[in-house]
Amino acid sequence: MTMPGNRAASNSPALAGRVALITGASGGIGQALGRRLAAAGARLALAYGANGAPAKDLAAEIIATGGHAVPVQADLRSAEAPAALIEATEDKLGPVDVLVSNAGLGRRQSVEEIASSDFDDMIAVNLRSPFLLAQRVVPGMRERGFGRILFVSSVAAFTGGSVGPHYAASKAGLHGLTHYLAVRLASHGITVNALAPALITGTAMLPGDPEELRARIPVGRLGRPEEVADLAIAVLGNAYLTNQVIGLDGGMYPR
């Protein structure tokens, strides 16, 4: 199946027919991930929070072009939501083979402005929910001898970023989770990786004037959600790549 505007529409044998759950499917990166995974032949659960229209529209678009997709609502601030989301996905599509944990909060606050409830919400969505989702899908992946887990992090995990300490801490936690899971699951055919994008259009990743930011980026422009999705497909389709956190920032933050 070829999705509109997809330069990376070649099917990945590793992903064709697999059930893939994407959280944050209403955002710019989530939408691009959905289109790329559909083009790779995956059957999709598109999870969304408060804003369901984009995820529902994307599901309809994928179905209209011959693919399989269902929108699923989940408030990932709730500790019960990840289990309910996995259950709903499995009821509609079957066991989850590919987990792309992309949902995230990014409320900008200074150290002085952050209440304990703000910190708790950030950790709940950005770190606890990815862990709980992975915890639910790993047993089935291990039993089937195949699994792909991809966490969408941020360069804020490396640099501290500009959103706030609660955001940076939550994203840094994802890197630790990635490394812990990857080492222990590799022998079961499960890969675990993370992407750390920055300065992507159509997202909340732009801490300032786009023109000023563009001038500071070595490649001379902002990134596109489709470029994040292209990298995600390459990572998910590679059985030898695991335990990696890959930056995608136009060369702005060398590591």
PLM regions with names:
Residues 134, 170, 178:
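Active-site helix of classical SDR
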Residues 154:
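Residue(s) in the substrate-gating loop at a strand-loop-helix junction
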